[in-house]
A protein has these predicted regions:
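Cys-nucleophile CN-hydrolase/nitrilase-fold catalytic domain and related Cys-dependent amidase chemistry
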Residues: 14-91, 97, 167-186
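Active-site beta-loop-alpha junctions enriched in small/polar residues
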Residues: 29, 72, 99-101, 141, ...
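Feature marks short, surface-exposed loop/turn motifs that line or immediately flank catalytic pockets
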Residues: 30-33, 102-104, 238
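CN hydrolase (nitrilase-like) catalytic-core segments centered on the catalytic cysteine
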Residues: 48-69, 135, 141-230
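Short beta-strand scaffold segments in enzyme catalytic cores
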Residues: 69-71, 84-87, 127-129, 210-212, ...
Length: 255
């Protein structure tokens, strides 16, 4: 498994492939980061024309790897914008796609607030799909704060949870590691969390710290500073052992 930062996703993808990665993932909003709705409408593409999506489907097919395009901003025929994640299989076909459900509508401080619902149309569908190594559940960034989504995915069979993100520096320092580890532990699942890093605009700095976390909550790999890739091996026998020894999917006492 390899997680690749968006700034270098095209240039450095082969590093992860050459090291044997079977799944490569990029962070949230791989193609463009902007809070300007009109700029996005002018800059992004319809799904069938998006150059990032086209390029990554070609790479997946050529290299026979799976690629999670963490998310890209896409527009539809009605000029509506979506924050959409794509899982591309090793044949270069789109295995599934997921539209971010929970919009980042928050006030962090007097000087820092966000209103994604003014930019994107939220998704409505929980997405879990089959892969050669088991089922994967897709999510994006702010979804991380809503545990019900992940429990639903695990009950649908997910063994891996993907959370491509662009956490702000403020919220990242306070909550990122705790939230990612908690989702892994409470769901007995591997969590893949590639994260945007750096100064994106005058108003927005993203925290980075891409993570790969085990079902026991152990950080298997972390990009602690700067840009780059991280890799880890996933042991699904260990996942099944943890779930058997720590059965947290029993019928709930409280209903």
């Amino acid at each position: 498994l390899g997680l690749v930062g968006s700034e270098m996703c095209i240039r450095d993808r082969n590093k992860a492939i050459d090291k044997g990665a079977f799944l490569i993932s990029t962070p949230e909003v791989t193609n463009i980061i902007s809070l300007d709705r009109q700029k996005l409408k002018r800059s992004v593409f319809l799904e069938k024309d998006d150059p990032f999506l086209i390029e990554f489907t070609k790479i997946a097919k050529k290299k026979s790897v799976w690629i999670l395009l963490g998310s890209i901003v896409i527009k539809d025929n009605k000029n509506k914008l979506y924050n959409r994640s794509y899982l591309i299989n090793s044949k270069g076909n789109i295995q599934c796609k997921y539209d971010k459900i929970h919009m980042f509508d928050v006030k962090i401080s007097k000087k820092e607030s966000y209103k994604e619902s003014k930019i994107f149309k939220p998704g409505k569908k929980v997405v879990v799909t089959n892969t050669p190594w088991g089922k994967i559940g897709l999510s994006i960034c702010y979804d991380l704060r809503f545990p019900e989504l992940y429990r639903k995915q695990v009950m649908m069979g997910a063994k891996l949870i993907t959370i491509p993100s662009a956490f702000t520096t403020t919220t990242g320092k306070a909550h990122w590691h705790n939230l990612v580890k908690t989702r892994a532990i409470e769901n007995g699942s591997y969590v893949l969390a590639p994260a945007q890093y750096g100064k994106n605009s005058l108003k927005r700095h993203t925290y980075g710290h891409s993570l790969i976390v085990s079902p026991w909550g152990e950080i298997l790999a972390e990009k602690k500073a700067g840009k780059g890739i991280i890799m880890a091996s996933l042991d699904f026998k260990e996942l099944h052992k943890i779930r058997a020894n720590m059965p947290s999917f029993r019928t709930q006492i409280l209903k």
